A protein has these predicted regions:
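Conserved C-terminal "lid"/linker of ANL adenylate-forming enzymes
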Residues: 294-295, 306-308, 320-360
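Gly/Ser/Thr-rich phosphate-binding loop
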Residues: 157-213
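AMP-binding/adenylate-forming catalytic core of the ANL superfamily
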Residues: 247-328
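AMP-binding/adenylate-forming
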Residues: 70-77, 91-154
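Conserved pre-ATP/AMP-binding loop-to-beta segment of ANL
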Residues: 8-12, 40-57, 88-91
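Conserved AMP-binding A3 loop
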Residues: 51-80, 87
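Hydrophobic alpha-helical segments in the ANL/AMP-binding
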Residues: 10-24, 82-83, 101-114
Length: 360
């Protein structure tokens, strides 16, 4: 089958591509966006593929993105399982780039649902105003959107001050948040005010989220193998076999999956182990912290924590060295107005690492 490429900034073209993919006319690859009308150089793609609906690049937050082939059967299973869990198909508001799995799913599921998605310009930085404007254009049926935690934080802060923003969020039947561990203060606060925040866990290799609020889709099995999360089911990417052992740490508690963080984000400092994802979760609970990313800094004396955050200059991060462990004392700390992010909306860990190393 021919592989057709569409740039991410051509969202209508990408939406039409999904229709062709579902009709089994072509396979699709959504490339990074054009810059000044010039398409990015894309190397290594085949002209044709077999048993493939979409080739999707992973976010590449820690390095070079991987290209992952997904079959139409896997994508259809994921779309139907998601709709079943959410209470039915509906209209989607696109707030994420379409060349990554979460944004691509919005388009794919819109075609499956036979609904017209409302399309934000995801090539521009996310703003509450643009989101609310998009939400106001949605129909009266079931409403969904998919966000990353940083976007949800901005909406949560705005909803505290602006009744109209809050009312627009209440109109969504579900707001999915995924891509990384969420800020649980935001999730719990919005839920307490009647907004249905669904915490999604998955990755490109699983056609996106396959666990909602700790519960796997029907037909999907999630277990832990030596602490690593293992997923099996009909939505796995081509070539993975019957199960996929992720690089994420987790545990099953009362029948629900709790994601603890990435296995490659555990440092050893002074003989003490520290999960950077756990550090971030606890640091986000500190008063005055809006957004935060932690990375490992390595020297001849071992590893330590480096932190870049958005928030008050008065935040006391030293609290964490007593409440978590001595390893949680940051070696480097930078306060910024905006976290460096990839086009996927995830933190740019490589850039953040460079900033912190340059500050030492």
């Amino acid at each position: 089958m021919q592989l057709k490429t569409v740039p991410a900034n051509d969202v209508f073209g990408a939406l039409n591509l999904m229709t062709e993919v579902i009709d089994r006319k072509v396979a699709g690859f959504i490339s990074p966006a054009e810059v000044n009308g010039i398409a990015p150089e894309v190397k290594g793609l085949p002209e044709s593929v077999t048993n493939t609906a979409l080739i999707i690049e992973s976010s590449g937050s820690t390095g070079v993105p991987k290209r992952i082939a997904l079959s139409l059967e896997a994508m259809l299973f994921s779309a139907q399982a998601s709709a079943s869990r959410l209470g039915g198909h509906g209209q989607w508001l696109l707030a994420l780039p379409v060349n990554f799995i979460a944004g691509a799913n919005v388009l794919f599921r819109s075609v499956i649902a036979d609904t017209q998605p409302v399309l934000m310009n995801t090539q521009l930085p996310f703003t509450v105003e643009a989101f609310v404007r998009g939400a106001s254009l949605m129909s009266d049926g079931r409403r969904y959107t998919s966000l990353v935690p940083a976007q949800l934080t901005k909406l949560a802060q705005a909803a505290e001050q602006d009744a109209f923003v809050f009312s627009m969020l209440r109109k969504f039947d579900a707001i999915l948040v995924g891509g990384q561990l969420p800020n649980w203060d935001d999730v719990l606060e919005l839920r307490s005010r009647g907004i249905n925040i669904v915490v999604s866990y998955g990755m490109t290799e699983t056609c996106g989220g396959c666990v909602y609020d700790g519960v796997p889709f029907d037909g999907v099995s999630v277990t832990t193998d030596s602490g690593l999360i293992e997923i099996s089911g009909p939505l796995l990417a081509n070539g993975l076999g019957e199960s996929f052992v992720t690089n994420d740490l987790g545990e099953i508690v009362d029948g629900k999956l709790e994601v603890l963080g990435r296995a490659d984000r555990v440092i050893v400092s002074g003989g003490l182990k520290l999960s950077l994802d756990h550090f971030e979760k606890r640091a986000l609970e500190l008063p005055g912290v809006d957004e935060l990313t932690a990375v490992a800094l390595t020297s001849e004396f071992g590893q330590s924590v480096g932190v870049v955050y958005v928030g008050s200059p008065e935040v006391n991060f030293l609290e964490l060295s007593t409440s978590i462990s001595k390893a949680a004392k940051p070696k480097a700390l930078l306060r910024v107005s905006e976290l460096p992010k990839l086009s996927s909306g995830k933190p740019d860990l490589v850039r953040i690492q460079q900033m912190l190393e340059a500050s030492l």
